[in-house]
Amino acid sequence: MSAETPITLNMDTQDLQIQTFTVEKLLEPLIIQVTTLVNCPQNPSNRKKGRSKRARVLLASVEEATWNLLDKGEMIAKEATVLKEELAAALQEVRKESKALKVSAERFTDDPCYLPKREAVVQAARALLAAVTRLLVLADMIDVMCLLQHVSSFQRTFESLKNVSNKSDLQRTYQKLGKELESLDYLAFKRQQDLKSPSQRDEIAGARATLKENSPLLHSICSACLEHSDVASLKASKDTVCEEIQNALDVISNASQGIQNAPAPPEPQAATLGSAFDELENLIVLNPLTVTEEDVRPSLEKRLEAIISGAALLADSSCTRDLHRERIIAECNAIRQALQDLLTEYMSNTGKTERSNTLNTAIVNMSKKTRDLRRQLRKAIIDHISDSFLDTTVPLLVLIEAAKNGRVKEIKDYAAIFHEHTGRLVEVANLACSMSTNEDGIKIVRIAANHLETLCPQIINAALALASRPKSQVVKNTMEMYKRTWEHYIHVLTEAVDDITSIDDFLAVSESHILEDVNKCIIALRDQDADNLDRAAGAIRGRAARVAHIVAGEMDSYEPGAYTEGVMRNVNFLTSTVIPEFVTQVNVALDALSKNSLTALDDNQFVDISKKIYDTIHDIRCSVMMIRTPEELEDVSDLEDDHEVRSHTSIQTEGKTDRAKMTQLPEAEKEKIAEQVADFKKVKSKLDAEIEIWDDTSNDIIVLAKKMCMIMMEMTDFTRGKGPLKHTTDVIYAAKMISESGSRMDVLARQIANQCPDPPCKQDLLAYLEQIKFYSHQLKICSQVKAEIQNLGGELIVSALDSVTSLIQAAKNLMNAVVQTVKMSYIASTKIIRIQSSAGPRHPVVMWRMKAPAKKPLIKREKPEETWAAVRRGSAKKKIHPVQVMSEFRGRQVY
């Protein structure tokens, strides 16, 4: 391609730095051959000297690799239109160094144990590698020159498009620009894939996206400017788009040449919060022997103050609620005091070989305060996300509607609201990044947020232009293009923020917010406030839709099974039944308020459907958390402990939870409950031993057994004041879930029993199924008895012990029945397979496959925290007699 304008290459032709994978790959064969050729021992051998046939073969390989590179270099030199002299000189240098290596290598192969000859070969090999590298780097520069020529060609057409004076020239120039963009994008993509630097690859990818996105916008805006040259906002939009395109061209030019673009603005201090918390938690556990106040105190205090500064930024954010601001401040003060107490204890223990109990207590307290502050920050951020991303497009739609109707006076107010809305979205997105460790997700969030910031003033200018020319079709088209672009990046930002946010935290906070909105709805209805009722109902619909969307997306990442089916059943119930019923009731209420006929409205029916939508959200959250570990459940439980909201529709949100009341039982009752729980855990260990050997990917019986086991464990945790179940209604719901799982297990096991040809085996399996049905019903009764516990005179009545004991006993009996059912189902399945295999293939009800053992490394890798350890002496080899090994072997326990 001939360049009309000289292309300036900002690359040093003498620089041997390899920037691309292609050059690296071309050099690799030569490096391997040369390295193998000169790879001989440092100390010469005393053996008889002789010629090495292997070395001569390697020398031939080096020559072959060199000549292959020379052939490619000569082809490039013939086709090149630039750097011809440099290429010719580089080729000559490679030939010269190749001959020098050949001479020194032949001498070396005659006497491979003579060190001076070896050193001569090494020097010649290095010179050859340097010459070849320079040749390949020059060839790479020619590729860059080709790309820059396309950039220059696009630049010229781009300048022509900016200055067109009529629509025919505009259309012709835009078509030419489209073709050149296609060629430029292809070459830029190739360069992007070839560059070794991840940051430069990302820069080119972003620039390519900017060119594709802004080129159609430029055409539309230029067309509008030709029709309405007197509209200043159109000219401002055109200047902004042109600046974006020019910046993208500069980025491609610089990144392809390895030039660092303008440094990105420093991340806000809050962006380091997550890693700062991790570092602080790792540093608070020290050895008293090595602690000195001069080193430890300034270091820990500096790190803590950095965290508190970031927390203060979050607390002062316009999105932060007053309640959370106060709690963040309180936790900051508490962690400051905990650190001072910890440092005081360290100074008291200086020089001691072991930590005292008070020091250990101070360390535990500091860790707890760190977790508490982290939790408060996380809650505040989730609050912001839940509120800000509730309805992301309404401000834009209102702005566009005002512009279409030509309401110029209102545009400024709506533009200010839209600008504030954009700023809030960007601020909340950055806050979400501050506590996340998902680097890829954070990168996507920041890119999308930057695009929204750039689009905001352009959209406002487009709206101003539309307001001044509401009947112009080209201005309408421009506004529509901006709207689609905005909606695209809003979708990207929302998905990215959801991706870096814990779904458990989001569901817990969303449940709380929906309860607040439900209360606002009921208050507004009773106060006959139609505006607040409509606003709160809209918030409920938006939050419920967000919950359904996020949970459905989360389930897409799981293999279909009992877990996903249970979750999606609740989600579908929410979207297909509950939300439509709620919308209907809200419309009825609003209609009644507008006609002043509130007396004809059934107030209780509205309260019931409002409570139903909250209960469904709670059910979705419980079903999502069914597979969580006890530690994860406890963390989410802590997230909610101080997030209780008093409900006007349910007395259960007043005062302490029933779970908290269980901790106030007399010590004698607690001991008896602990004994019952210990017996239950013994039975649980039997079930664990029975199901842990089976692969549950195609065995729903094992899946259901695990699920029932987990729910029963949660119910027993409730009796000790722990776990995710907070109210007696949760216990009743858990018993209902167990009953449903038992019914599904009954269906599967009965299919196995019906196919089993062994009557005794079939009879035993059916008997165990009857036990599951009986004990499931008993468990439901016990959970309902527990719900009747009352608080009289500030103390729990004595019958609580009997209720709890009955609950745990029923759970233990049910667990035993599940254990026996799993065993007998497997036995019956084996009989079906053995007897009916000769009659032809038959699909089994479930597949009984042994679980594959966990993968273990052949060589134990040293843990990062153990890298400081001194070199240890190898343990002495010890012979163990086989009889001793056999005597210590213990198989799986049979119950």
Swiss-Prot record:
This is Catenin alpha-3. One of its GO terms (molecular function) is actin filament binding. The keyword Glycosyltransferase does not apply. Pfam families: Vinculin. Residues 74-107, 325-379 form a coiled coil. Residues 635-660 are annotated as: Disordered. One of its GO terms (biological process) is bundle of His cell-Purkinje myocyte adhesion involved in cell communication. Belongs to the vinculin/alpha-catenin family. The modification Phosphothreonine is found at residues 361, 649. GO terms for cellular component: adherens junction; cytoplasm; cytoskeleton; desmosome; fascia adherens; lamellipodium. Expressed in heart (at protein level). It is found in: Cytoplasm, Cytoskeleton; Cell junction, Desmosome. PANTHER family: ALPHA CATENIN (PTHR18914), CATENIN ALPHA-3 (PTHR18914:SF21). Interacts with CTNNB1. Interacts with PKP2. Its main location: cytoplasm. Keywords: Cell adhesion, Cell junction, Coiled coil, Cytoplasm, Cytoskeleton, Phosphoprotein. It comes from the Eukaryota. May be involved in formation of stretch-resistant cell-cell adhesion complexes. The modification Phosphoserine is found at residues 160, 637, 647. InterPro entries: Alpha-catenin/vinculin-like_sf, Alpha_catenin, Vinculin/catenin.
